[in-house]
């Protein structure tokens, strides 16, 4: 089973489409609602507020993520020890934090998700294999944060990999990023090459983590 955690806009059609793409590959996938009550917003001000409420409240984030995980586990096709999580933007930061605190996940894939955290991983706490996809033109991440993330993962003894796409900006996997960037003057943009490559690598990643015993 695979959990999909949405961007800061909420559990919208994009997040559900990503879950459907995973289902088409044969996985049981669930688009998690980290905001509650199906909240979906259409502007950065509201999105930032909702994202901050979750990001700054780890107990709440953990509870909501685990509720989604339990719902997925209740499905007859899902093995309790065979769960992975994909996260996009805000959701990328969420799934990385869930890995940091030791959730029972086989793998975590973060797509243009934040790498910094207020909850750094303790040595040998992380159970999940981790892969992070970022663009080197993403001002929300930056080389310093990538370096700090690598150091954190090394110190935690994590099995991780960081993939950096030259020229790719924040939200590179979302085809609507160009329009949203222009509308709200945000430093985001779709990058078809990075989108395709990260998805192909993520598919291989899932096959590998679910094959590992």
Located regions from the model:
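Primarily recognizes the serine-hydrolase "nucleophile elbow" in alpha/beta-hydrolase
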Residues: 65-127
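Short, proline-enriched alpha-helix->beta-strand connector loops that line the catalytic pocket
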Residues: 125-130, 156-159
